[in-house]
């Protein structure tokens, strides 16, 4: 029986997108996309999510791509401009789960420890969680099984009693290998349907 819900944050509850900031720098959309795909890549950003300092991450990239120094430094100096609004349809589902008083609800997020306080101050609903495990603080990230285990052990969660929600299939598969039932998030509407199918929501 499910008694614990574990949410991912980015792309599920919070809209974070580097395009929002870099569109103010690049006049050409394709040029911007090429920069994000080849310079400030997802793999590079995930190193900071896993605990590398923003300063070190920036310095490594500037050394590798000195011709892009200004635009690389903008990634974290203007990081807050990459934050969009909350995904309010999903927040409403979170609220409904919270108000049912049936579940402990946690967040398991790949997020830099240095930028996460900005999100905490901006999105009030983050205070609704019974606990948040941040990759940058723990120095490891999804899909490492040890990262999931931190949450399970810290909050005395049994895998078979938990439900995990994430937009990244890689992270879903890792959770399922640990025996955690999971929902691959694609939209708030489909999430609500699946939660009803599981009798998690009425």
What are these regions (language model features)?
Residues 1-5, 112-113, 120-202:
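Asp-based, Mg2+/Mn2+-dependent phosphohydrolase catalytic module
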Residues 2-92, 112-115:
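N-terminal helical cap/lid subdomain that shapes the substrate entry/recognition surface
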Residues 8-11, 51, 97, 107, ...:
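Generic structural signal for small/hydrophobic residues in well-ordered secondary structure
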Residues 20-21, 43, 56, 60, ...:
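Alpha-helical elements of Rossmann-like donor-binding domains used by nucleotide-donor carbohydrate transfer enzymes
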Residues 26-29, 90-137:
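Substrate-recognition/cap helix-loop segment adjacent to the acidic, metal-dependent catalytic center
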Residues 63, 67, 96-102, 125, ...:
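Secondary-structure boundary motif
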Residues 82-85, 104, 139-140:
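Glycine-/small-residue-rich active-site loops that bind phosphorylated ligands and cofactors
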């Amino acid at each position: 029986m499910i008694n614990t819900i574990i949410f991912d944050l980015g792309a599920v509850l919070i809209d974070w997108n580097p395009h929002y900031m870099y569109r103010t720098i690049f006049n050409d959309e394709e040029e911007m996309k090429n920069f994000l795909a080849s310079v400030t890549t997802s793999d590079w950003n995930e190193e900071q999510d896993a605990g590398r300092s923003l300063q070190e991450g920036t310095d490594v990239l500037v050394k590798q791509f000195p011709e892009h120094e200004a635009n690389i430094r903008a990634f974290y100096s203007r990081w807050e401009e990459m934050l969009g609004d909350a995904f309010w349809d999903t927040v409403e589902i979170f609220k409904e789960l919270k108000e049912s008083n049936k579940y402990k609800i946690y967040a398991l997020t790949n997020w830099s420890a240095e930028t996460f306080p900005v999100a905490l101050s901006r999105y009030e609903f983050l205070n609704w969680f019974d606990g948040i495990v941040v990759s940058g603080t723990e120095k490891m990230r999804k899909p490492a099984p040890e990262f999931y285990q931190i949450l399970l052990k810290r909050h005395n969660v049994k895998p078979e009693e938990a439900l995990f929600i994430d937009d990244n299939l890689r992270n879903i598969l890792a959770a399922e290998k640990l025996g955690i039932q999971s929902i691959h998030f694609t939209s708030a509407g489909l999430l609500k349907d699946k939660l009803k199918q599981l009798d998690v929501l009425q």
